[in-house]
Each structure stands twice: as C-alpha cells, then as structure tokens.
C-alpha cells in the first residue's frame, strides 16, 4: 500500500488510505464463526488471533503506517459512501495482499467497493489478490461480487491464477501485474531504512 501510495503521489494525485481497523471482539467472533463454516466444508483454515494478540503483533507495522501514510479516520465497521464524500475522493483503488479472500475480510464485498456503488467515482483494482488459486466465495458472495466487479473501470491481479478466477467466477477480464512493492526503486526503500540502527559486526 505504501509503494502504490508513493507512485500515485508522484503522478500528481492526493492519496488517502481507508483506515479499516478490523480487530475488535465482535469482528473476531464473526470471523471465528466463518472459520467454523469453512471447516465444515472441509477447508483447512485456522482460527485467527484475538484482537489483543493481533494488535500486539501489528504494533511495529502500525507505527510505520501512522508515520508514512495519509489515513482517513479509522473504522472498525464497514465504510460508507459518506466516507468517500468526506474526503472528496474521485477514485477508489483496491489492492493488494489477499484483499479478495473472504475468510480474511469482515465483509469481502467492501473490497469490491459495495459501500460506494451509488457514487460516481472511478473504480480500480491494482494487483488485487485472492491469496489462493482455489475459489473460496460462497454462491451468494460470488453473485454479488461479480456484479460489483463489473462496475470497475479496470482490474488487475497480483497472481496469474487470479486472471482465471476473475474470468471464470466474476465474469470480468483482469490483467496480471507486478506487486506494488516492485514499483519503487531500491533508493526509495533506502530512505525508509536510514533511521534503523545497524547491528555491529561480530
């Protein structure tokens, strides 16, 4: 997300990241029920961490995000069209790591921009990832997300297998592209590392 933000900023865009903080106990309980449902279908999935465990694990990442990225006000529930209007957004970009994997999202429809379907904005998926080459959506999710995907102005995916998943299950064409982390140069990452203390040689 940081890499794509930097690329878009260099193209002259103002970039906001929708800050979706999903780790509250209600969402975790909902996730646990969905994991149980997947297990009943024979899928090999694990229970997620509790909100406290997840927050502790992500603390270093959160510090990076707060320092280097421009965030909207955080939400623990679904975004709404009011969020888009508040920040005067004229385009929404979805991506990348496993954003289209239902078991990793409170409501995968939001990653197909359901909350903004009534708005006149550009919709783009850059390097969106299913995280697997198997289709994990329910029939209801497939039907609704296929309709939402058809509203996108452009769709690209991170994995080659995602091209086939989009065609076979969502009925849309997708392009296979680089992971956004590869859009930057080594010098860009060197700037981020300059304040990291270096270990002394043995």
Regions found by a protein language model. Name each.
Residues 2-147:
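Aromatic- and Gly/Pro-rich donor/ligand-binding loops
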Residues 89-90, 156, 176-177:
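Nucleotide-activated sugar donor-binding and catalytic core shared by glycosyltransferases
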Residues 99, 161-162:
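Alpha-helix capping/helix-boundary segments
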Residues 119, 151, 169-173:
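Short, structured coil segments at secondary-structure junctions
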Residues 134-138, 182-196:
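Acidic anion/phosphate-binding donor-loop and adjacent secondary structure
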Residues 152-159:
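A short beta-strand/loop micro-motif in the catalytic core of glycosyltransferases
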Residues 163-181:
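Helix-loop-beta element that forms the nucleotide-linked donor phosphate-binding surface
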Residues 197-202:
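Conserved donor-binding/catalytic core segment of Leloir-type glycosyltransferases
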